Amino acid sequence: MENVKSKTEKSVVAITRGGRWEAKKVIKKGLDLIGGINSVVKKGDMVLLKPNLGYPEAPGMPPWTCTTDAMVLAALTELCFEAGAKKVRTGDMPAHHVRASYMLASTGVQQAVEKVGGEVVCLDEEPFITREVPGGILLKRQALPKPILDADVIINVPKVKPTRVGKWTLGFKNLFGLVPHEERMERHRVPEHFYVLTDLYKIVKPALTVMDGFVIQEGLGPRMGDPIDFGVVIMGKDPVATEAVTVLAIGHEPYEQMVLPIAEKQDLGTMDLKKIEIRGESLESVRRYTKVSPGDLWLNMSPNVVEYFGGACWGCGFWIQYTPYPWEIDKNKKYALIVGNRPRLPDKFTEDEIIVMGTCATRSRSQILKACPEGMTPRFIGGCPPYWQRAHGYYEYHKIDQMPRAPKANFTDM
């Protein structure tokens, strides 16, 4: 699907306002501003809506504060049918091996889309088929759920909220939910992660991005952020322009969304406002500052933990705050946490316990052992990133361990 261009050859992005209870009206208005739903969906098309159902809502909060609103997905389903779509399906694969069927049901998405004639598809239960990535830089071949490859039209429907890897989980980040669980953690290293996202776009090729900004998050996203009644939907066919305008609308600059300069360099769209035509509401009328997630917080908040750093990437950076976990800390002890390549070490450790995390730090094993007091044995946590070694505690900490688990991916060579 080509980006909508005006006579001045600008990418077109629509901004519309309203309440989530009038989602269809607000979304239709935006669609009409960029060429109408018929410019995206044709008669007989099989459409797949890709929401963000990555995380369950925070305790005590309604689902639409954390995941793509069921009302948005129901509205898009109806509009696609009105354009002549043969079938409209909604599907995702949540984060951290949570089962898709659980999230589709618990968020109300399944009930909402089925009520208007749509279907849900549990992408984690579908066969994964490997395809070449056209123009792939990091990904040359990628396995994707079969319904993605079967769809005539894919509409990307992210939730506007901050995340810990990058800044905001918007259009490009939302495509990461199509990667098999078995491949996700090794692709969370920065900046590698952003090249994965742009390569995913090249094979998935969403025809349209619709940002659900009715209720957004700020702060401790992607799950525990504070909800804000924003009442805005932003959409467009240029994924870079649509994401750039969204970042501006929530009070920040496009270059802060680290995937965008990479995507623009690869000619996936533009983040230059001079090359973007905004229709509907003005950017100034909706713009408000929102807090980002503390993803760059490279420390453990416990006063009992002393960090010794070398050159580390975000693959280990995320796990610093969780190593050790609060329940692993004895308040009467001090812990040395060593992370990164060629870490700066003391002549002798004075802490009671020593934790060495990640493949890079493990390479300094001999120097670390030399700095240990006699009789002390460090605890080595390997991995790049060390996800699998720390994941169980993370699941327990966020109560994810109590949720149904996704099946192993069924990789099919078709």
PLM regions: where:
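N-terminal and secondary-structure boundary signal
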Residues: M1-M414
